[in-house]
Amino acid sequence: MFYVIGGITVSVVAFFFTIKFLFELAARVVSFLQNEDRERRGDRTIYDYVRGNYLDPRSCKVSWDWKDPYEVGHSMAFRVHLFYKNGQPFPAHRPVGLRVHISHVELAVEIPVTQEVLQEPNSNVVKVAFTVRKAGRYEITVKLGGLNVAYSPYYKIFQPGMVVPSKTKIVCHFSTLVLTCGQPHTLQIVPRDEYDNPTNNSMSLRDEHNYTLSIHELGPQEEESTGVSFEKSVTSNRQTFQVFLRLTLHSRGCFHACISYQNQPINNGEFDIIVLSEDEKNIVERNVSTSGVSIYFEAYLYNATNCSSTPWHLPPMHMTSSQRRPSTAVDEEDEDSPSECHTPEKVKKPKKVYCYVSPKQFSVKEFYLKIIPWRLYTFRVCPGTKFSYLGPDPVHKLLTLVVDDGIQPPVELSCKERNILAATFIRSLHKNIGGSETFQDKVNFFQRELRQVHMKRPHSKVTLKVSRHALLESSLKATRNFSISDWSKNFEVVFQDEEALDWGGPRREWFELICKALFDTTNQLFTRFSDNNQALVHPNPNRPAHLRLKMYEFAGRLVGKCLYESSLGGAYKQLVRARFTRSFLAQIIGLRMHYKYFETDDPEFYKSKVCFILNNDMSEMELVFAEEKYNKSGQLDKVVELMTGGAQTPVTNANKIFYLNLLAQYRLASQVKEEVEHFLKGLNELVPENLLAIFDENELELLMCGTGDISVSDFKAHAVVVGGSWHFREKVMRWFWTVVSSLTQEELARLLQFTTGSSQLPPGGFAALCPSFQIIAAPTHSTLPTAHTCFNQLCLPTYDSYEEVHRMLQLAISEGCEGFGML
C-alpha cells in the first residue's frame, strides 16, 4: 500500500512539472512569434526561446553600491547584472539596449549617467555611475530593449550633507538690530549644506550647542570693557529645516555679535546690536512714525578729515547736480589738504552742530548766530551709509559716532543721545529697503517700488521702427523725442523690410542687439583695460568724436528700461547683456574709488604696479603723486597731478595707500566723469537713484545682468578636444562631460575660473571665447588637472573610472584657480 501511494504521488508531481514545462514552452514560443521587432529578436531562433537562451529583463538584477539613506555630493554607482532567461550570465559587451533614467521626483531634474561594462569575471555586469547635488527623492528607471528590469523603477532618497557655515544664513538679516533691554528677540537660521540644500539630518538640528553667540560692546577700550550680560537659547524645527536662536540682552548700549557653527562664523552671522531702554524705544518708534518731519539731535562735530578710523584715505569725490549725490555746503572743508587725513588728533574745540534724521537723509547743520542754519554734511539713509560706534569723546565725555558713506570724508560726532540717533536712522533705513537686507528681499522691494513710480504711466504699446543694418543710429532716431512716459511703455519693435509681428520675439531680439551695439568694445563707446575679450567693459575716455555724450544718456535709459521691464516680471523680464567693471558699477551708486577695484577691472595693472607698490619699500623709489599720460605712439603727452602739488610730493610707505586710491580715482573715475554723468542722467530718468542705492556694486550687477548661467550644452558644443588616445576620447571625455553636467552653477563658474581666469563668460557665451576653450590630453595618469589660463586650456590626464574623474576635478576647482600639478 505504501508503494502504491508513493508511486501515485510521484506521478502527480511529474505530471504537474510536465504541465509547467509545457506552459513555459508555449509561452516562449508565443513570445517569439509575437515579437516582430527584428532588432530586439536579433539572430535568436525558436530553439533559443525553448532553451531560455535569450536576455530576459525580468531575470536581470540591480545591486547598489551604497546603503540608504546616503548624502548628496558623492559619486554614486549601481550595477546591472544581465542574465539569460535560463539564469546563465549574459555577456554585457553585446548590444543590449540598456537605458538608465534618473530624475528628481519633485524638481523633475534629470541626472546624467555613465555606463561601463566590467571585465572578467563580471563580464555580465554594467556599472552605472552618477552624482546628485539636490537632496530629495529620485526615480531610477532601468530598461532593457524598452522593458523594465525587475522591480524597476526604483526610488532612492538622498539626504542633505553636513552643515557648511559659509552657506548657512539668517533669514531676514539686518546688519544692525535695534532691540529693547530685557526683551527677547528670535533669529531664524536656515542650516544649509555645501550644495545649498536645507539640511535636517545632521547634528545641526540634533545638537543645538553647535551654535554659539559671542557679543562684545562697541566703544570701550579692551582694558575698560566688561562682560556683556545676555541670555541665549537655541531650538530647532526639523519640519521647516530651521534653527531658532532666542536672544535677550540686559544692558543698554551698542554691541557687535557673531553667530558661529562649530566655531566657524555663518554666512551673514556678524551684525551690530543697539539695545535701548523701554523709554528710548518709544522715542525711536515715535521718531520713525513721524512722516515727512526731520528729528534733530544736539551733537559735537570733530575734525571731519580725521580718516584714522577708515581704510579709504581719500578726499571726497565731487558730484554734480545731475547725480544728486550728498554734498557739503562748505566746499572749503571738503578740500582740506590730503595730509590732514593722517592726523589722528581731534580739534581742540569741537563744533556744536545739530543732526537731523528724516526718512530719506541724515544731515549735519551748524547755526550761525543761533538762528542761521548752515548745512555741513548730508548722507542718504541707505545701506551704503555706515555707522561706527566709539567710546566717550575726550572733551565732553559723550558717546561717539562715526558716519561714513564712502563718498565724503568720515564724520565723527559725539552725542548725548547717540543710541537714539543711531536707532532712528537704522529703523528708517529698514523701512526704506522693505524690512530686510537680504539680496532677494531688496530685489522684491526695488521692483515693487519701481512699479509704483511708473504706476500712473500707461504700459500701452509704442511702435519702434528700426533698421537692422544701422541699429544704433535708427534706434537713437526712433527714441529721440521719447518722453519718460514713452520709455515706460511696451516697445513693439518693427525691423525695416521684415514682416514679423512682435509678439515678444522682435522686442527681445532688439534688446539683445542694442546692448551689443552699445556695450561691445568694437563700437568704442565702452572699452576694456586689456585686450582680453573676457575683460570687463568701462566707459571709453578716448572715444571717437562722432560718439557723442548723448549716446551715454541713451545707454542709461536702456539700462533703466531693462530694470523697469524686469520689475513687471514674466515675459517682460529683460537683462542687460554686458559685463561692467566694478568701478563703473560703484560710480552708478555713488561709491568712492578704491585701489582694490584694479584687481577686477584691470588685473594686469594691479599685478604689475599696485602689488609692486604694496609689497615693496618706497623709500628708494622716485615716485610722486602724479600720473604720466602717453599718446597712441607711446610718447609722453602730459603729466597729471593727482592732487595739488602732486608732482613735488613723493610717495612714501606712510602715504602709498593714499596714493593708490588717488590713482584709482583718476584712472577709473575722473577720466570718465562726463560719460558717467550722462549715463546716470539717462538711468535716473527711469530708475530713482535712491532705489539703486540700496544695493552694493556686486548686487547691482546681479540685478542688471543676472547670474550669467553657464550652459553645459553650449560648453560641450564649443569646447575643442586636442589629442588623446581612444581611451581618453571615448571613456575619459564621456566621464568628464557627465561630471560637468552634474555640477552646480557655482562649480561651473569655478571650473571656468580655473581654466580661463574669469568666472564669467563674454556675452556670446563659449563661442565668443578667444582662443576657444580647449581640453588637452595631458601625458599623465591619475593626477590633478592643470590649466593655462592665457590660452583657455584645460589639461586633463587619463583616469581609470568615473569616480576618479569626479574626485580629481572637484579637488582641482575647489582648491583655487592657479592650476595644479601632480599629487
UniProtKB/Swiss-Prot annotation:
UniProt repeat feature Filamin, residue ranges: 52-158
Active site: C790
EC number: 2.3.2.26
SMART domains to which the protein is assigned, alphabetical: HECTc
Superkingdom: Eukaryota
Assembly information from the UniProt record: Interacts with SOCS2. Interacts (via HECT domain) with HTRA2, DIABLO/SMAC and SEPTIN4; in the cytoplasm following induction of apoptosis.
Name of this protein: Apoptosis-resistant E3 ubiquitin protein ligase 1
Protein species of origin: Homo sapiens (Human)
Organism ancestry: Eukaryota, Metazoa, Chordata, Craniata, Vertebrata
